[in-house]
Amino acid sequence: MTELTATKEWKEYEKYMREAIRQAKKAYVLTEVPIGCVIVYEGKIIARGYNRRNTDKNTISHAEMNAIRKASKKLGDWRLEGCTMYVTLEPCQMCAGAIVQARVSRVVIGSMNPKAGCAGSVLNLLEMDQFNHQVEVVRGVLEEE
């Protein structure tokens, strides 16, 4: 156990990741790839999403995209500055791009995705200096769950 895993901040990461896992279970029930996501602003969950690509027959119905859409509507702004996204699986290139474009402040990831992950596995779009916005990334929260 590292120092970070024992901190109050890490416990908060686990709390919200558990809700993202609950969202992933909703996708699983629909026979979707079980990925879940929540977005937190000022200590409150403002949006939830889960993978619905097959159900919606829509390429962009990933958990992160669904949650970003709901969070933007809730805040009345496309900018999600000050928001933290909790997602059960490392975002793909589409979702990573949307996260950067939405100006999400932090992304907390459960498991990495060595096949298509764009927060450090295949690419790291979230922390690229070349973009006008970089996202703080925390990896490995409740990875075994």
Describe the function of each predicted region.
Residues 41-42, 69, 81:
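A cytosolic small-molecule/anion-sensing beta-strand core signal
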Residues 55-65:
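A short, polar/charged loop-to-alpha-helix boundary motif
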Residues 31-35, 81:
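Short, basic and Ser/Thr-rich N-terminal targeting/leader segments
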Residues 35-43:
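Short beta-strand scaffold segments in enzyme catalytic cores
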Residues 77-89:
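Immediate flanking context of iron-sulfur cluster ligation sites
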Residues 1-30, 94-145:
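Zinc-dependent deaminase
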